[in-house]
Amino acid sequence: MRNCRTSTNEIDLYVQWTEIARLTHLQIAFPYFGDSFLCECKNYGEPVGVTYVGKFCSLLLCSNVSLGVMISWNGVTGRGKWDASKGLIKKFALKENRYIVVLDKNDLKQLSRKETNIFSLIGNKVQALKLDIDYSTYLKSHPAESEFARSGEK
């Protein structure tokens, strides 16, 4: 559906599997899409700022979907991985277990040249985001853990 509205927001695209796709379990092959996802299109001359990314985060929450695709020719703001809009996208993923992927001019050019397809592109970006926020490799056992474990047995 295009440009549908909630009571407070407009949704550019609400994408869901067709009945045939659901009956053939196509969504199992692409689990990162869930049953549906939102798509936000921003045609700005500059990267999308943190305010609009924050509004998109809010829209994902109130729509109860776990994937959002933001299409922005110039991407989103942030000099480093954890700065501005890029940082908000990662923090949102960590806290809410919901993912926003950004498709920029490079991605759109790849799609138009048929160097990739939309399923692979979005899937790779979701996977990259998940790996980027995974902190488990940095967790090491603390020497006092065994003491806590023993005191819990009493």
Residue ranges of each PLM-predicted region?
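Mixed-charge (Asp/Glu-Lys/Arg
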Residues: M1-K154
